[in-house]
Amino acid sequence: MGAFLDKPKMEKHNAQGQGNGLRYGLSSMQGWRVEMEDAHTAVIGLPSGLESWSFFAVYDGHAGSQVAKYCCEHLLDHITNNQDFKGSAGAPSVENVKNGIRTGFLEIDEHMRVMSEKKHGADRSGSTAVGVLISPQHTYFINCGDSRGLLCRNRKVHFFTQDHKPSNPLEKERIQNAGGSVMIQRVNGSLAVSRALGDFDYKCVHGKGPTEQLVSPEPEVHDIERSEEDDQFIILACDGIWDVMGNEELCDFVRSRLEVTDDLEKVCNEVVDTCLYKGSRDNMSVILICFPNAPKVSPEAVKKEAELDKYLECRVEEIIKKQGEGVPDLVHVMRTLASENIPSLPPGGELASKRNVIEAVYNRLNPYKNDDTDSTSTDDMW
């Protein structure tokens, strides 16, 4: 859903921080979409005796940004302040936390519905949500919709959330039981996710509870015991990222970037840029959370990266010189490079992850190019 721009908006919003033995960075980009509907939350050290806990989440809005923005500001409070989460005196148990997360989602969804109807009529926007609540002993993965989170442990994808799509058999059964249908893999032929916050037009079937509606606000929650030796990093991202990169691809790419820089904002920016150049047409947001045992910068990897960049610079110069009269356009350069067996390209990112390096050399050698010929579109690029 949503209209597209003539050129992508590539300006990024960044943030980073550290605490509780964690480091995080994030990046978000509007991309080709007419509006930016993503939002995010990053909190290290929670109030009310949970100073050693942290919370991170990505919200992918649709049909507007209102629900995503409200959730990024208030969902955490709804989770930690309800009685199911607090339980009895002392630190909440695993079951307290899981029940509290579920209750928090249902409460904020109902609160937004009532608030929307009172203020200005029903808000038709909605949002997916993917997040992690990290305690000293556990990582709680939270998912509602088709954004995704994964845990990289011991250099492999150890866990990833499951997308809530209407075509999923259990989701489809609930939709049909509520009187709906799944057409072209969408709820009633329209909405591409089967669980979300907001989307109140899909939550008005009389006689059905909130988790039995066409679209459910109920999250899936998984608790994973932390492993100090093996846990490396967590990635949370909206579907604008996952549309063009698989779980293993993104895990490998991030790991390779962490071996050449400890700047987590830079790593996230590279993820977003690479996904844009791989053809993503959606808003893009990614949060990278690193545990103490995350990959460290390797002098050997840094050297190989510099050698690769130098090689690409030389090849771009050669391609342009070989053309003779008339400078080839950037698409021609990219296609030529894509046809070659270039060693040491970043795993998962491949040539797309080096587009900025290639373009910088191209622009330096061709400073008087016509901007109209230098499209950022990736359609049929290579």
Swiss-Prot record:
Residues modified as Phosphoserine: 375, 377
SMART domains linked to this entry: PP2Cc
PTM comment, free text: N-myristoylation is essential for the recognition of its substrates for dephosphorylation.
Effect the entry attributes to changing residue 239 to N: No effect on binding SMAD2
Domain PPM-type phosphatase, first and last residues per copy: 23-291
MF (Gene Ontology): calmodulin-dependent protein phosphatase activity; magnesium ion binding; manganese ion binding; protein serine/threonine phosphatase activity; R-SMAD binding
Signal peptide: none
Function per UniProt: Enzyme with a broad specificity. Negatively regulates TGF-beta signaling through dephosphorylating SMAD2 and SMAD3, resulting in their dissociation from SMAD4, nuclear export of the SMADs and termination of the TGF-beta-mediated signaling. Dephosphorylates PRKAA1 and PRKAA2. Plays an important role in the termination of TNF-alpha-mediated NF-kappa-B activation through dephosphorylating and inactivating IKBKB/IKKB.
Name used for this protein in its record: Protein phosphatase 1A
Organism field: Homo sapiens (Human)
